[in-house]
């Protein structure tokens, strides 16, 4: 009964909210089959991965960088992944006229493929790369088709649009600005272990006074920063919310 009541309350909150902000992490994409790179058995468990994905390594050895980049993110098979029920749910909220912005730590681009229009890619995206000289952009298929992708105009080795270790977060200020405007913050599928994103729930609740909602299979240690906590997969949460009439 309490669980049903929580769903009812959250549904009403979303109906009344003027501005909804959603923070998503790996759990938003694992239901599409994408591995959680930060899990115990994930690719980030390799001690060398941070070095291979660093700005310094790209600058020193761009050809070797691209070899490891493609292996780590398995980009040759990335087309197989499709948006799941959670991605579609957020796009549907937007289609209903809600002012919704997604702040995602994911680099897979599935929110955009799922038709969400207002997405801030905090850690960049695997879907594109660009020429460091002329800034011409290239898509995922171009990266797949070329062992070491180069600009067709300048012949420079492309720069991936993923935020590398050693980079700043170019979208951080835009994310903070949105947090201070929001009525509701929904955190979905993230363990909230990586700063500065881990501070977002506290900012939303303590400084902004927004209603905060957590949807994550495992506890994060930040439950005190949330008004509602759903220890579920995102798909389960969406189905529970959809069942409330």
Curated annotation (Swiss-Prot):
The active site is at 123 (proton acceptor). Its cofactor is Zn(2+). Coiled coil: none annotated. NAD-dependent protein deacetylase which modulates the activities of several enzymes which are inactive in their acetylated form. Keywords: Cytoplasm, Metal-binding, NAD, Transferase, Zinc. Nicotinamide binds at residues 37, 107-108. Gene3D superfamilies: SIR2/SIRT2 'Small Domain, TPP-binding domain. GO terms for cellular component: cytoplasm. GO terms for molecular function: histone deacetylase activity, NAD-dependent; NAD+ binding; zinc ion binding. Binds 1 zinc ion per subunit. NAD(+) binds at residues 26, 30, 37-38, 105, 107-108, 123, 190-191, 216, 234. Belongs to the sirtuin family. Class U subfamily. Zn(2+) binds at residues 131, 134, 151, 154. Pfam families: SIR2. NCBIfam families: PRK00481.1-1, PRK00481.1-4. This is NAD-dependent protein deacetylase. It is an enzyme of class 2 (transferase). Its main location: cytoplasm. The gene is cobB. The keyword Nucleotidyltransferase does not apply. SUPFAM superfamilies: DHS-like NAD/FAD-binding domain. It is found in: Cytoplasm. Its EC number is 2.3.1.286. Residues 1-245 form the Deacetylase sirtuin-type domain. Signal peptide: none annotated.
